[in-house]
Every structure is written in C-alpha cells, then in structure tokens.
Amino acid sequence: MAKSEFIIKKNLQVAKPLCDFLEMEALPGSGVDPNIFWEGFSNLVRTYGPINKKLLEKRAFLQKQISAWHQKQNGKKIDLSEYQSFLGNIGYLLPEKDDFEIETANVDPEIGVVPGPQLVVPITNARYTINAVNARWGSLYDAVYGSDVLGDTPNSSTYSPERGARVVAFSKAHLDKFAPLVDCTWSQISKILIVDNLLSLSSGDKKVELLDQSQFVGYRSNSSGVLTEFVLIKNRLHCRIVIDANDIIGKSDPANICDVQIEAALTTIVDCEDSVATVDTEDKVLAYRNWLGLMKGNLSASFNKAGSTINRNLNSDIQIITPTGAPLILKGRSLLLVRNVGHLMTTPSILDENGDEIGEGLMDAVCTVLIALHDIKRQSGIKNSTMGSVYIVKPKMHGPEEVRFANDVFNEVEKFLQITPNTVKMGIMDEERRTSINLKECIREAKSRIAFINTGFLDRTGDEIHTSMEAGPMLPKNDMKFTKWIKAYEDRNVDIGLACGLQGKAQIGKGMWAMTDLMADMWEQKIDHPKSGANCAWVPSPTAATIHALHYHLVNVTAVSYTHLTLPTNREV
C-alpha cells in the first residue's frame, strides 16, 4: 500500500481515504456537524488514549506477577486456596459486591425476548453480509436437502425426488412437534384454505384443527386471492408454510406445500474483529462503508455465476393478514450488531497530537456509532433497530476496569454525537480469564447499556494457556472441551447473567459451531445450548442458522432460564 496522505483535523492526523469517507459519506445525513464531530473525536483521543495505554500496562504487570508466582512454585502441586489468595492480593480476582439487576432499556425483541440463532459474518465481504442479513428466514427444505442432517449428502447436482421425499418427511415430522394437530399429522393434510381469515385444514373429508389454535398468526395471498403461505408461531419464532401447486415440490405434495420457511438468524454480528483483516486504511474504509450500507439499508453486491451476473440486495419486510383481518409486518432482515476491536490494537489510519497511532477500538467506537445514526434517525423505510439503539460487541476485555473504560468511551461518544445516553448497547465477550472470574462486576460496570454476554471456547482457552504458561504442561486444546472447568465456565456465564437480570433485557449467548459441513452433528449436539438457558448461540452459515433454529422450537428457553435462577452462581471456574 502506498503511504497515506494525512489530513489535519483538530489535533488528529487522519489518513485521507478515511477522512474523505467520513466527510463525504458518513457525516452527510447523520445530523452531526463536521466541526463538532472532529472536536469531539480529538478530545476523546486526548482523554482516553492515555487511559487505554495504562490498562494495557496493567495487563502486562499482572501477567508478570502471575508468571513469577508459578515459577516460584517450581513444579510443585498448586495449593488452590493459596493461589486464590494471591490473585486477590494483586487485584486480579476482585471481591463480588451486592446483588443487582441491569437497567438496560430500549432493546429490540430479538435481543431481549426472542431466543434464536446468531450469525457472525465478516463485514468486509458485502455478499456474505447480505446473505447473513437475509438469513432471518431460511428454507428448511433447502437446508436439510443440501446438508448431511439426513445422514448423507446429495450425490448429484440434479434434484433427487427420493431425497426430496425424505426432506419433506423430516420437515413435516418437525411440524408435528412445532404445531401439533388434533388426531392427525402434517403428512396427512390434503387441503389448506383460509376461511374468514382463519386456517382451515383437511385430511381427505376430515376437518383438522391445530391443537393450539393461537399458533396461527396469519397468511398471505397473491393478487388473484390464491393462498400462498400461512404463518405459525412457537416460542415467539415464526414458521411460514409456503403453498404453490405449480412448484416441482408443491405439485407432488398432497396439500401443495412447497417449502417451510423458518425464522432463523434473528440476529447477526457484523464483524470488524476476528473474522476480518482490516490493517490498512483502505481495509477499514471498506468495513465502515459496508456498515454504512447496512445502516442505510442500501447495501448491495454483484457476482458472476455460470456466466451470469447475480445481484444481491437486502430483503424487504413481509406483510401478512392476521385472523382479525388486520395487517401484520414480519421482519425480513436479521437484527444487526457490530463487533468492534478490543483495547489492544492501534491503527495507522489516525495519529494523535504526538504522531502516535491511536487505539483502533477508539476509532471503531466513534465511526460505527456515527454511521449507526443513519438508522437511528431514519423516519421512514426499514430500520435495523425499531427501538432506536445501536448494538456494539466489545471483545477481549480483561476485567471490570476495562469494561468501565469501554462504557466511559461510549458515554463520551454519545455526548459529542448528541444522542440519548445509553443509545449504544454493549455486548461483553466473556472470553478472557480476568473477565470470567469477575463477570458479575464486569456486568455491573455496564449495567445501563449491557445487552449481550457470550462465551467463546477458543479465546477463553487461549487466555488460560497464556496466563498460566509457567504453571507447567497444559492439556491439548481439544481435550479441554471435556474438562470440568470448561463446563463450569459455560454454566457460570448463564447463571451470573440470569442473576444479574439479563433475562428479557439482553442476550446470553453460546459460542460458534465451527464445523460448517457437519450439520448432522450440530443437529444432535447444539440443542445443549438452548437447554443451558442461553437465549442465542453462534452459527457459521444461513444453513446452520435454519437447522439450529429448530432447537429453539423444541426448547422453551424462557422456561429453562427460570429454573437456572435457583442455581448458585459460584460454580468452580
């Protein structure tokens, strides 16, 4: 990359590509005066840059003491009570204060009350990002047909009626659990009508009813008045049964059902951190420009396939007619969060008054919130957050002091962008050892804006290895999956989250299923995440989101979480 030209803005030197993007694309339409923006940005860097550096120095100071303590043990068996006292004495393990509940307000239903899958997608890939946003709805027929959920994968690129029949049988068997019928199964339904805005089902000459008729939400018809789909609901998740007698699947189905559309990726994290490499200014501008397209609702992508140009755009919402005859809007897009980088890295895109690189996390905080104003202040069209919030996930924070720092930074950003306090909602990744053991106090530091906590096996075990490197040989990383402490870490995250009042106000998440081709294994195993009381879990693809969504049909996470409220939060970590 050629060396960037820098533009002076107050006490900052800003790489020209970034400066041009902010002044020509991000600021126009945001309602923020450019002079106020640069003044606020400059003051934030001057105030919080030195604090950021001191926090990193404290990390190194604590690590040096822990390594020295282990070296002093010289290989002898560790006395856990002595070790715990040592961690407390150096300020690594902090005392827990009184119980409290979070005060987060104005969260969207997908964050607070509707459990479901969560996608993570690299923000620099517009095509993948659009696919993720549109994965709010996924075809169950396609997901099962194209994966190994049935025990095998397709052996041909041409459609197999035999495999298709197995897919339909699997899907209708799931419908029997999702929305059971009175003395009938979905495979026996032969006619579907809407009569006076109500669902009418038949099996031959026999009328059939839903066991719970309140599960019927509404329907859609085409311009000729022909029924095209009807909508059911369970555990706040919708399912659209699509009808088309002319479709290759529908024409062979006794009720002309051609697909089952599952409400799948309720939320998506668009990622500026682990899944991308945004080192140079041009990389960061690409990331921010795609975020701007999402917040404006106009992100698009084109690619070539088999000699043809394919265009991708964001889906529209879906309007249905309810049993009362009134219209109802179902969201067509996943609710978006954006993951900023943590406190560690600096960026060459902006230099401070001393000519030093500023913290990349500070730049992300300012730029991603500024861009989100295009959604927050929009008066018409499809909004990301109907509650006027922006959701930012902060990764790799070490303990309550670093969470407090992030909270203070967001306070300052809200002030100079002149938006309501706590508009920015924070997600805390519980992936560092000092955060895990002080999780309750971490949550307390962001109690008015926290909207998400999540565990992560790879980063958490990585920090365990790094912190305790001098303690002696470690288990192979893969073997750690089966240790007591990993289970305790996962359980304790849920227990503390619930004890701090996250239920109904925030997400309690579980980590990624990284094996994208092993959907049968995921179908068998990942149901453990909703069973744990967590109300979201990460998935790697729209197909995985569709399959994992079925788990939330089978498990009432809200009910499970109430049972966890009676459990102790001091499980061994």
Residue map of PLM features:
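Charge-patterned, long linear interaction tracts outside catalytic cores
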Residues: 500-558
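Conserved small/polar residues in nucleotide/adenosyl-binding loops
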Residues: 563-569
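Hydrophobic faces of well-ordered beta-strands that scaffold small-molecule active sites
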Residues: 337, 393, 426-428, 451-455, ...
